[in-house]
Structures are given as structure tokens and as C-alpha cells.
């Protein structure tokens, strides 16, 4: 592939689907705090003036779903009824049952390492050396734009901003290398009393310029800031939100394949989540070790079975060692059985709410972002 464009998008913590994700993961964290062995599949639906929390949960813990929901919405910034959604007055409904005993008998084992996968499925992990966090640049900078929007909204720099926002960045590539940014889209919810010209100037100066590297911007870069001209009605008043509806935003922005399973609200026994994290960990360590410039991992499972049904390594012709050797290294250094990867990444802790906005990958504070096996892989591969 010679010259081409590639685009990724992100959404802010105040986007309706992300509100739902954060509530689901806040419930999960509260339960794991008391009961690390809990089985949680928590789904959330948000619309004007209401939140519905449902799913299947089996636990010895007791948590206050209503309080968790209100606190999460409050932290995001929906605290006035004029936004169409208010943490203090929205209705909170709960429809939670227990996990099926048919699933439990396939997952639970006396020997923990033989714990079966909570479902069948396929998961992907990806890494590339085009950014310092070993993530694709388009999704990385799309996330950083909406993170910056939240920052200047919350610290009072731009007090007329509201929680809902979206970003989209189109990068120019030449022979696989970034040569510039072709287009930037940023749409942000705002108060009624800000005019379009003032908004566009402030967004450019306070959000876009501090985030996007100047060497990638030029006179032909196109900027679309609130291109409809008005974005007052937003959040759950503008659109309903559902857990698990932003799976490409959550992962690699379309640069890598996706197995289809969402993450938020699921405890680590659900391989949709935990194995996707493990696949990222494997791919990132392979790239960090210098064994490839780009790496995509696929892993698959059968419900109730511990060993993965398949492991694939794709390096797009950038590998520095034979592909067959990479597979052997993965099997030697990474335990991808469900309980093995939970142990490997220390996943039975309340760390999930933070993942639910601005991407699950590329932020160094998560355990699956460690590159602690890179040197081991490099030595085992015989690279100097």
C-alpha cells in the first residue's frame, strides 16, 4: 500500500453510549471490591431522565445500584435538568438476575487453571510502533482530543462546554508511514449562549492545537468544528445510550480486526474482555521486543474449555523472526487459558471503570499495557 488515508473516531465520557459503559463498569468495580470471584454481566440503557441497569450477576456482595449510577452520571457532568439529564433527579431502574447455572458448571473448576471459558468466541489484539504507546495514531489522537475536551470543560477553561463530544481524525500515510493529518472533526455539545465563531476559535486554540503535533498539520489540513452549526441538545436527551455500542472506539479505531464482543460490565471470566486484553498484551510485547513492527493476535475459545481453540499471529510482513517461531514464543511465554490470563494480568481488581471512556488500550496504567516480557521474548528469539 503506497499513499492512503485512514480515519478513526472517538467519543467523550458524556456520549450516551459511554455513559452506559461507565455505569456498567462502575457496578462491576463495586462488586469486585467486595467479591473478586463474582460473575457479572451488567448492561445499561440511558435515555432522557432515566437509566435502566440490567443483566446477570452472581455474587456475595451487596451494592447500591442507584447510588453508583447517580455518582457516575454526576462525575461525568450531567448535573442540571437543562441538559436533559440530571444525576440528582433521573429515574434509576434495576432489572438484574443471576448468571445461568448452565454457564457456571462450564466455567467453575476445582483446579482454577482448568477454569473454562465463559463463552465461545474470537478476540483480537494489536500493536504497532507508529506511536510511543504502540497504538495506531488515528485512534490515539482521536481519544486525546475528546480527553482534552473533558479537561478544559471540567477545569473551567471553556465553561460553556457540555459533556457530549465526538472527534474524528484522518491521517495520511505513505508506504505505511505517517506523513500528515488530512482532516480533523470535532463536535462538542455547548451552552446556548456561545456563538459559532467564538466556539470554533476556542476549540482550535484550547483543544486541537495543544493535542495534534504541529509537524503533521499543514495548510491543506481540513478542520470541521461543530460543522452543523449547533450542538445544544446532546447526551441522553439527544440519543439513547447502550452498553457495548462503541467497540471500535474501545479498541483500535478500525485499524485491526474485532471479534465482536464488547467489554464493559463483564467480569474477567468473560473472555470477550479478558482475552482481548491478553491479546493486546501479547501483541504489544512482540512489538516492544522488536520482533515485528506491527502485530495482530487472534485467540479463540469454546465455552467450558480452558485451552484456546486457536492462536494466530499476523505481522503483515514486518516480522524479524519466522512466523512459526513467533507462535512458539507466544505459547511459551503467555498462558492464555482463562484463569492463566487473569493471573498473568492480575484482573480480579476494581480497575474497569477507568477503561470505559477514552479507550481500553494505549494508556500505560493498565496491566495489559506492560512490556515486561519484551526482553524475554527478544532473548528467546536470539535477537541482539
Curated annotation (Swiss-Prot):
Function: Catalyzes the formation of S-adenosylmethionine (AdoMet) from methionine and ATP. The overall synthetic reaction is composed of two sequential steps, AdoMet formation and the subsequent tripolyphosphate hydrolysis which occurs prior to release of AdoMet from the enzyme.
Pathway: Amino-acid biosynthesis; S-adenosyl-L-methionine biosynthesis; S-adenosyl-L-methionine from L-methionine: step 1/1
Record-listed Mg(2+) binding positions: 17
Cofactor: Mg(2+); K(+)
Keywords recorded for this protein, A-Z: ATP-binding, Cytoplasm, Magnesium, Metal-binding, Nucleotide-binding, One-carbon metabolism, Potassium, Transferase
UniProt-annotated binding residues for K(+): 43
UniProt entry tagged with the keyword Transferase: yes
PANTHER family, sorted: S-ADENOSYLMETHIONINE SYNTHETASE (PTHR11964)
Top enzyme category: transferase
Compartment annotation: Cytoplasm
Gene Ontology BP term (one): S-adenosylmethionine biosynthetic process
GO cellular component, one term: cytoplasm
Alphabetical list of CDD domains matching this protein: S-AdoMet_synt
Family classification: Belongs to the AdoMet synthase family.
GO MF annotation: an example: magnesium ion binding
Catalyses which reaction(s): L-methionine + ATP + H2O = S-adenosyl-L-methionine + phosphate + diphosphate
Record-given protein name: S-adenosylmethionine synthase
A Pfam family annotated for this UniProt entry: S-AdoMet_synt_C
EC nos: 2.5.1.6
Chief location category: cytoplasm
Region entry Flexible loop, spans: 99-109
Binding site for L-methionine: 56, 99, 239, 270
Amino acid at each position: 500500500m503506497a499513499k492512503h488515508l485512514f480515519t478513526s473516531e472517538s467519543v467523550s465520557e458524556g456520549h450516551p453510549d459511554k455513559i452506559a459503559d461507565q455505569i456498567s463498569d462502575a457496578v462491576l468495580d463495586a462488586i469486585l471490591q467486595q467479591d473478586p470471584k463474582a460473575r457479572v454481566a451488567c448492561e445499561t440503557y440511558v435515555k432522557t431522565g432515566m437509566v435502566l441497569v440490567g443483566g446477570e450477576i452472581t455474587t456475595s456482595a451487596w451494592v447500591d445500584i442507584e447510588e453508583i449510577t447517580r455518582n457516575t452520571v454526576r462525575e461525568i457532568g450531567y448535573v442540571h435538568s437543562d441538559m436533559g439529564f440530571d444525576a440528582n433527579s433521573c429515574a434509576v431502574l434495576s432489572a438484574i438476575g443471576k448468571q445461568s447455572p448452565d454457564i457456571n458448571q462450564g466455567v467453575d473448576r476445582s483446579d482454577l487453571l482448568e477454569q473454562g471459558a465463559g463463552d465461545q468466541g474470537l478476540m483480537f489484539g494489536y500493536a504497532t510502533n507508529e506511536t510511543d504507546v504502540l497504538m495506531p495514531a488515528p485512534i490515539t489522537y482521536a481519544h486525546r482530543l475528546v480527553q482534552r475536551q473533558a479537561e478544559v470543560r471540567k477545569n473551567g477553561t471553556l465553561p460553556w462546554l457540555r459533556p457530549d463530544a465526538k472527534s474524528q481524525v484522518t491521517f495520511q500515510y505513505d508506504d505505511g508511514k505517517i506523513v500528515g493529518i488530512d482532516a480533523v472533526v470535532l463536535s462538542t455539545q455547548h451552552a446556548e449562549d456561545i456563538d459559532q465563531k467564538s466556539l470554533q476559535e476556542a476549540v482550535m486554540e484550547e483543544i486541537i492545537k495543544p493535542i495534534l503535533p504541529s509537524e503533521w498539520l499543514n495548510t491543506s489540513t481540513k478542520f470541521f468544528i461543530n460543522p452543523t452549526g449547533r450542538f445544544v441538545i446532546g447526551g441522553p436527551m439527544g440519543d439513547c445510550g447502550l452498553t457495548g455500542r462503541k467497540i471500535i472506539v474501545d479498541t483500535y479505531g478500525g485499524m485491526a480486526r474485532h471479534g465482536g464482543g464488547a467489554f464493559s460490565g463483564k467480569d474477567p471470566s468473560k473472555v470477550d474482555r479478558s482475552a482481548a486484553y491478553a491479546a493486546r498484551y501479547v501483541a504489544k510485547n512482540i512489538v516492544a521486543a522488536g520482533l515485528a513492527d506491527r502485530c495482530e493476535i487472534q485467540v479463540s475459545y469454546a465455552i467450558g474449555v480452558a485451552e484456546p481453540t486457536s492462536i494466530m499471529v499476523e505481522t503483515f510482513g514486518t516480522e524479524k523472526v519466522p512466523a512459526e517461531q513467533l507462535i512458539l514464543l507466544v505459547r511459551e511465554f503467555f498462558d492464555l487459558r482463562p484463569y492463566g490470563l487473569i493471573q498473568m494480568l492480575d484482573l480480579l481488581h476494581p480497575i474497569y471503570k477507568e477503561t470505559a471512556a477514552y479507550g481500553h488500550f494505549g494508556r500505560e496504567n493498565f496491566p495489559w499495557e506492560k512490556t515486561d516480557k519484551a526482553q524475554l521474548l527478544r532473548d528467546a528469539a536470539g535477537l541482539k
